[in-house]
Amino acid sequence: MARKIFKYKGYTLEELQDMSLEEVMELFPARQRRSLKRGFLPRQQIVLDKMRKLNKEGSKDGRPVVIRTHCRDMIVLPEMVGTTFGIYNGQNFVEVTIEPEMIGCYFGEFAPTRQKVQHGDPGMGATRSSMFVPLK
């Protein structure tokens, strides 16, 4: 079975990577377009510079290099596809490898800050009514 070719608003990944930032910006939704029109923040520029440097020289031992960042408001650009980022979620760094489907999204969407609480069985002293729960 043939693998489906990724397209973002009718453009393939190669076409997106050949476009300038201004041309790609016009394809993004309004919120991302507005953010990019204002320019990159200094911390976002640092992330971009690190990524471009590592993509140019590559890793020394063949393993993918993880770029760690606290910058959760960075927008995924076409040139980032294939790069691995460690995105901080407030407790630790979540490793995310950027795929073509992530273009136009924010880093923070891939590293949730809250986890669903999973409560255990009530034990002795867990609640007022647990005084009558037999001990296991």
Curated annotation (Swiss-Prot):
GO biological process: ribosomal small subunit assembly; translation
Keyword S-adenosyl-L-methionine: no
SUPFAM superfamilies: Ribosomal protein S19
Disulfide pattern: none
Keywords: Ribonucleoprotein, Ribosomal protein, RNA-binding, rRNA-binding
Domain of life: Archaea
GO CC list: cytosolic small ribosomal subunit
Keyword Lipid biosynthesis in record: no
Pfam families: Ribosomal_S19
Gene Ontology molecular function terms on file: rRNA binding; structural constituent of ribosome
Region described as Disordered: spans on this chain: 117-136
PANTHER family, alphabetized: RIBOSOMAL PROTEIN S19P FAMILY MEMBER (PTHR11880), SMALL RIBOSOMAL SUBUNIT PROTEIN US19 (PTHR11880:SF2)
Function per UniProt: Protein S19 forms a complex with S13 that binds strongly to the 16S ribosomal RNA.
UniProt-listed NCBIfam families: PRK04038.1, uS19_arch
UniProt similarity note: Belongs to the universal ribosomal protein uS19 family.
HAMAP family referenced in this protein's UniProt entry, alphabetically: Ribosomal_uS19 (MF_00531)
Name of the protein: Small ribosomal subunit protein uS19
Species name: Methanobrevibacter smithii (strain ATCC 35061 / DSM 861 / OCM 144 / PS)
Lineage, uppermost ranks: Archaea, Methanobacteriati, Methanobacteriota, Methanomada group, Methanobacteria
Gene designation per UniProt: rps19
